[in-house]
Amino acid sequence: MSKKPTTKKEVQTTGHQWDGIEELNTPLPRWWLWTFYATIIWGVAYSIAMPAWPIFSDKATPGLLGSSTRADVEKDIAKFAEMNKAVEEKLVATDLTAIAADPELVTYTRNAGAAVFRTWCAQCHGAGAGGNTGFPSLLDGDWLHGGAIETIYTNVKHGIRDPLDPDTLLVANMPAHLTDELLEPAQIDEVVQYVLQISGQPADEVKATAGQQIFAENCASCHGEDAKGLVEMGAPNLTDGIWLYGGDVATLTSTIQYGRGGVMPSWSWAADGAKPRLSEAQIRAVASYVHSLGGGQ
């Protein structure tokens, strides 16, 4: 007896065909579909229970559970602020020069000051305080405005040439000797050669000799007769090979031609009713930290 032939339902195709190869319209597995539906349900439920939809101008929907990571962070900040309240009050009440003699304050300022520095100062002065072009190193003892802790504190608090703070350190910008027609291009070239010479770099002897006289007449009033700089003017030492903007011919020429005048922001200034950028304790902590890095005077 012959067996009854079995018929197997063929899977339909999508109708797409490439070089004789057809795309089957195979149904997705049930487990996959149910998992997909479950994720949709979970997503809707999560968006209802937790903050999710930014339909308000300043915040998202709060969610039925009222969870807020921002509120959690604020609680943690408040908790640690309360823990540090006593030592911060002590720091504010202690004379700046006496901080280094107090082990508790030394420990606190090294940690808190480092945190402040990494948050607010490292963008310009570098993560290790080694400086960047246009932003001085805080490690080498080559200070434009002085490295005593009181000076560091004042400069952090009120900034340098900050137009917003009336108590900022106002020192004159370096003149633009070419733009302001103070020197001719040939004279600038001679001064550049002189600066190269006194900083220990190869220089044209003839031009350097002529540049020495021009320097004495136009530059010594800020940089000093010996070119070692004057803290009162914020003018750098030109003999030690430490350069804020660069000591090559092109950079020196540009500096003399167009001048320089860096700005450091005031970290205590605030608009009326606004909160200062840094608190008094934070300013003291970071000033003490910077002073302890090795370059403090």
Curated annotation (Swiss-Prot):
Transmembrane segments: 36-56
Periplasmic side: 57-297
GO cellular component: plasma membrane
Subcellular location: Cell inner membrane
Cofactor note: Binds 2 heme C groups per subunit.
Highest taxon in the source lineage: Bacteria
Family of this protein: Belongs to the CcoP / FixP family.
Name of protein: Cbb3-type cytochrome c oxidase subunit CcoP
